[in-house]
């Protein structure tokens, strides 16, 4: 695959956002006006001899003017509603909630521009420009993940990308049985157990050698509905995204085949538990369809030991056990740019801090990247497929998810052709529709991601700096929270962060000193969340905005127990409460890496927390006095 040698040594992230206070607003308007003018000129210059369809007489008619007035009224109403009811997550240091932040100006401009053409990337003939851009984005995804022969594309979101990953795994795992039906010689001498444990590359090699029988083999695969219950278990960590359950339902393997793997005290997959589960099923002759490792879990930002999962697979393969590996890096995928040099080579760990310093990835000389996180990202290239969401850490507008596969030949296991949109065998520069789950899809999304990638190279000189700004901001926030204490209504409330971030997610709880009732602590945190969110009053006037979640026993097992016990609660109390309520922050703001910026907001955040806690306790006291 052709390498990207693009580099921006003097990149200034401040030039790429509209800005907290619209500091670059005029630049945005100038660029947008230029692009709109170019589109209008494009319309006028297409067959200029054609007559105008709308004349001065039309434009001066009462009905025309009335219609324009009505349209303006509707747009005024739209503007008022959006300005009144939207979340101010553009804020540099006020929004500490979901995976939202400033979006890149080039991505916004590209989307605004390309949507004027309304291209549909399902078919090249309806979107030649943006279909080729999406093909290029897919190649860039593959380079980012270290795939020499990979392929990728944009999807609506990470949920669909995960579903597509399971679709690949299901169909590939079923192919050996299909080959046995169509051409037994391809898999001669292999038992059913061996067929269920064939490595993906070996299956792809056999499919490639099936020649004219490929279509017949595909017909006899899992897409026919055969052997779905024979393919085995789909193992996911307890920190899984909820989309995996939906995917198992839709793909047809069933929820009973989805097995949660315990996580450790750092909220990463417990590799020993994973091995035990696999060996237990192997002893019962139940295969493992696949394993999901997460890079940037939704609620903790934890990065599973992908390298350890790969090492386990290599060990088990010697014993005749093999599983498909999918990395759900919807959240953390772009962080791999932190580890790639300008030649797309993975930077040795011993050189990483030096390279980061040379490229101004962090403002302070600290070790923000944990060795185990580095090792996990290095092993990405061993996974068969990876989910990556540009609309998260790619800082592009919704809706833009993505999936990338290790071997471009895998596309043939899920392909469908329709002559009116993508004819089989046609010589088309970007044939997307035949190899994806979705039908119609916005060309503007591809333009948006393409513009972001071409403004910020997917290496340490570009996106690495943006991811680094987020990570450094998260560490500043974590360190700030560690020492916070508040006096409210004669009580002392302390802040207890969950864990040091693997990525940029910071979770914490508020605990009243001396409280030994976990249910009461959960109530406090939920009440605080309500004060600091949309639940209580307009968001536009709130000085500190957060999100929350629950770590509950049905989903997490006892993995939160160590944290709960560190707060002074007993195991009995943990089982009685059944959950711990957490305040959760995805620190995506690109501004909090700067010490001066953070130091401005820190005391104001503390003041806002104090005010919200006072409201919480005032409400409690009022109820008690009624």
Curated annotation (Swiss-Prot):
Keyword rRNA-binding present in the record's keywords: the answer is no
The residues annotated as the active site are: 420 (proton donor)
Thermoactivity: Optimum temperature is 50 degrees Celsius. Only 8.5% of activity remains at 70 degrees Celsius. However, the enzyme shows poor stability at 50 degrees Celsius, the relative activity dropped to 14% after 1 h of incubation.
Q: Which GO terms describe its biological process?
A: carboxylic acid metabolic process
Record pathway: Amino-acid metabolism
Enzyme Commission numbers on file: 4.1.1.25
Report the pH sensitivity of activity. Optimum pH is 5.0 for the decarboxylation of L-tyrosine. Is not active at pH below 3.5 or above 9.0. More than 90% of activity remains over pH range from 5.0 to 6.0, and activity decreases rapidly at pH below 5.0 or higher than 6.0.
- List ligand-binding residues for pyridoxal 5'-phosphate: 158-159, 298, 389-391, 440
Annotated keywords: Decarboxylase, Lyase, Pyridoxal phosphate
* Stored InterPro entries: GrpII_AminoAcid_Decarb (IPR050477), PyrdxlP-dep_de-COase (IPR002129), PyrdxlP-dep_Trfase (IPR015424), PyrdxlP-dep_Trfase_major (IPR015421), TyrDC_C (IPR049373), Tyrosine_deCO2ase_bac (IPR022397)
Is Transferase included in the keywords of this UniProt record? no
Q: Which reaction does it catalyse?
A: L-tyrosine + H(+) = tyramine + CO2; L-dopa + H(+) = dopamine + CO2
Q: Which GO terms describe its molecular function?
A: L-dopa decarboxylase activity; pyridoxal phosphate binding; tyrosine decarboxylase activity
Q: Which top-rank group of organisms is this from?
A: Bacteria
* Cofactor entry: pyridoxal 5'-phosphate
Q: Which residues carry this modification: N6-(pyridoxal phosphate)lysine?
A: 392
Q: What does this protein do?
A: Catalyzes the decarboxylation of L-tyrosine to produce tyramine. Cannot use other aromatic L-amino acids as substrates like L-phenylalanine, L-tryptophan and L-glutamate.
Its quaternary structure?
Answer: Homodimer.
PANTHER family cross-referenced by the UniProt entry: PTHR42735, PYRIDOXAL PHOSPHATE-DEPENDENT DECARBOXYLASE FAMILY PROTEIN
Question: Which family does the record claim for this protein?
Answer: Belongs to the group II decarboxylase family. Tyrosine decarboxylase subfamily.
Record's miscellaneous remark:
In gut microbiota this enzyme is in fact exclusively responsible for the decarboxylation of levodopa, and thus reduces in situ levels of levodopa in the treatment of Parkinson's disease. It was shown that abundance of bacterial tyrosine decarboxylase in the proximal small intestine - the primary site of levodopa absorption - contributes to interindividual variation in drug efficacy and can explain the requirement for an increased dosage regimen of levodopa treatment in Parkinson's disease patients.
UniProt name for this protein:
L-tyrosine decarboxylase
Q: What is the lineage of its organism?
A: Bacteria, Bacillati, Bacillota, Bacilli, Lactobacillales
